[in-house]
Amino acid sequence: VKVKTALVVPLFALSLLAGCDKPAEPKLAAATPKPAASYLETIKARGKLIVGVFSDKPPFGFVDEKGEYVGFDTDLAKRFAKDLLGDEKRIEFVSVEPASRIPFLQSDKVDLILANMTVTPERREAVDFTNPNLRVAVQALVPEASPVKTVDDLAAKTTIVTTGTTADLWLTKNHPDWKVLKFEKNSESLQALANGRGDAYAQDNLVLFNWAKKNPGYRVLPQKLGEEAPIAPAVKKGNIELRDWVNGELAKLGEEKYLLKLYDQYVRKDLADGTDPSSVIVEGGHWKP
């Protein structure tokens, strides 16, 4: 009996040990995802607003004799920087061409495009536009001595455009049979016209008025190529926060008639006496066709 007892006790003890579970290891708390910084906070942390502008398209964006960016669009961008960051100098300008405006937004090279970009259905699919700040129509510039009198005369001529502009898109869609000569930069297109490589240059009318005013011997055809359309700043598709901030800024600036000040400084001198500023600028972002 004693032998049996001695054998049973260890076996019973082993069975107890086998039935015991190891203490459960404490579960690690799930990491709480850090909330993504807002886009405006990202700009503030960076300390500067990055804006795509033209460098050769007066009166909107150009480089002056001091090597500084100036113009209607660039001054508006500086005001944005001042109101967002407290200092208009906290801005970085990136030179863009018409065809690079959208890619620069999509690749995050810039926060904002302020480069005379006309709002079109095709562009709306690629970027988000804010409320408009300007209105524009496409017209054509020809030498004073040119036999071209109307837009219809261009059907038998060579029309110069800058790649990616509204004029380029409009002619491609509406007159695919016209002979069109394309250049990447506005300055290259104007030089090509001066050199006689084409008969006319189709571009936003305010740009052409500026050129004709400074360069005697050219005239702008009175007819428009297409309808009048809004021009607006643009942000990357989906950047609702920055878009809404710009809309609020445009509304606030409208109360102080800020765009009228820029119009008087950069645009008025290029237009005929008596031109209504509201035919060019859109104060407060309120578009009225």
Regions found by a protein language model. Give the residues of each.
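C-terminal motif of bacterial Sec signal peptides marking the signal peptidase cleavage site
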Residues: L16-G19
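Ligand-binding clefts/hinges and TM-proximal coupling segments of bilobed small-molecule sensing domains
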Residues: P26, T166-F183, V220-L221, A251-P289
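Short helix-initiation/N-cap motifs at beta->coil->alpha
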Residues: A36-A37, I91-P103, S146-P147, L181-Q191, ...
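Periplasmic-binding protein-like
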Residues: S55, L134-V142, N205, F209-L250, ...
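A ligand-binding cleft/hinge motif common to bilobed small-molecule-binding domains
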Residues: S100, N116-A126, W170-K173, S187, ...
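Short glycine-rich His-centered loop
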Residues: K48-G71
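Acidic, polar ligand-binding/catalytic clefts
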Residues: K78, K82, R90-D153
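Extended ligand-binding regions for polar small-molecule ligands
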Residues: D21, A30-K34, D75-D83, T163-T165, ...
